[in-house]
């Protein structure tokens, strides 16, 4: 699942390219979950030929083992490692990439906003923005949060109803109800428990 989540960072490059056309390079992201005894370390390098700032982040496998089926927790773990790494390494290239220097702090702020919006980081109140569920189709919700920990089907007034729950973290559960309308599951309501 980590590789599926890591693919989300590709969208950030598209956002940057549109917002900062003056950047004369792209970002490349690689996320690896490895045993800490492997000795492989995180690194960053600039590929001058392809004009890519490559950020290669290693994360300890033991952090992910309890959450094999919990995509939301995996995102949070990745965000916890990635954002400080990104900030530190990109600031280190401020003098080496002249196009980056004038927009560096904006790029960092945009990355933070992107990570909050995509549930890699909690917001300023320390909570995940679970309201993103309102903008997702049923399929996107399942993709975003992974398999629900609870799924029940009922019928009300001739309409099929599906109640779903996801354990987001130790303190948070997301509950959502969908109704089958015109062969499409539509969000009826959701709440943070």
Residue ranges and their predicted role:
Residues 4-9, 14-30, 34-193:
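Residues within mature, well-folded domains
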């Amino acid at each position: 699942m980590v590789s599926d989540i890591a693919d989300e960072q590709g969208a950030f490059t598209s956002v940057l390219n549109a917002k900062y056309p003056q950047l004369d390079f792209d970002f490349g992201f690689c996320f690896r979950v490895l045993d800490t005894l492997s000795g492989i370390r995180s690194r960053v390098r600039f590929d001058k030929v392809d004009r890519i700032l490559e950020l290669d982040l290693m994360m300890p496998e033991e952090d992910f083992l309890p959450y094999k089926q919990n995509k939301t927790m995996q995102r949070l773990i990745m965000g916890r490692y990635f954002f400080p790494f990104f900030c530190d390494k990109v600031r280190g290239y401020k003098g080496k990439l002249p196009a980056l220097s004038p927009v560096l702090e904006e790029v960092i702020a945009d990355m933070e906003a992107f990570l909050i919006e995509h549930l890699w980081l909690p917001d300023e109140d320390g909570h995940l923005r679970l309201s993103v569920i309102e903008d997702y189709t049923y399929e996107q919700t399942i993709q975003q949060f992974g398999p629900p920990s609870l799924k029940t089907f009922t019928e009300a007034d001739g309409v099929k109803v599906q109640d779903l729950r996801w354990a987001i973290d130790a303190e948070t559960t997301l509950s959502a109800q969908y109704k089958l309308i015109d062969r499409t599951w539509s969000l009826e309501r959701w709440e943070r428990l």
